[in-house]
Amino acid sequence: METLDLSRRGVLLNDEQLGPYPLEKLKRVERLTVDIVEDSPRVDEKEMAFAKCRLGGFGDVLKKRMEDFTVRVPIGASYYHFQKYLNDYPENEVAPEKAPLPEDTRIVTRHIKKMAYFTGAEMVGVCEVPRDVYYATKVDGTPVERVYRYAVVFLVRTQLPTIAASHGDEWLDDTVAYQAYQRLACMSNTLADYIRRLGWPARSDAFNNYVTIMPRLVALAGLGEFSRLGIVVNPFMGAAFKAAAVLTDLPLVPDGPIDFGLQNYCSVCKICAEQCPMHAISTGEQEEYRGYMLWRTDERRCVAHGAANPHGCTCGRCAKVCPFTRSEEH
């Protein structure tokens, strides 16, 4: 009996939309839409704003406030603690024999994306991971020595009805963030476990367990562009999303960055800067920051408000008022 060539019939490889958002309609470009200094050095995780604040880099008062950061509200604390246990879940070993996967890496890539959507992801992209995207060391000083070639990056929407009911910088913002982080930790650990069972190394890269600078992965995987907010904005979700990834050596096909005109848009739209309670968002031009040409955010002002916020903790006013976020509020 003749073997049915499923890939030729378009069952395993086709152009059908995988998730709820039409990513195939986006304009793909060869490079990110911001200029990059190619030889930018790897940075230590302790240099990230919230880690620096927790370690006392912004003073003892803010360091003290960080002791109960994210756990001041019962529901936020519940999400935070369970998400932490997911990160600490022991990894299974990589299977000693590799599964007989198709030789066409496009088929494998599409399958892995489908699995990511199956776990609950709302948007998925793939990229190669430059070495400078990996941290040099973790917060505790442990070197990040193991690097992987590819990243499967996925996003989930933060809950829009809750964001719409919030003014952006009270306890609700923290809760919707950790609700998303918990889901992402479950998804990324599940997908990494699955890939290891196929015989390929893989690890979850989720909040509180990152070894990469996640916004860069999101942009490289074609899931957004760098914005005036200082974070990545997605053309469908705006800034109301959270991200995680699975890092792996399983050969995959990268998607490539996107260009939906955000650099021009952000150059004239300054709503986020106008609405920022601490005036931490730049109203000026882009400048070099850690090897990238970006709109600089005053990290100390931003984190200080989040850590010492009398209404809760963290702040998401900029993400709430971004026009790309608000487009789906109703």
Describe each PLM feature range.
Residues 1-124, 147-148, 320, 324, ...:
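Iron-sulfur (Fe-S) cluster-binding modules
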Residues 113-114, 118-329:
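Catalytic cores of enzyme domains
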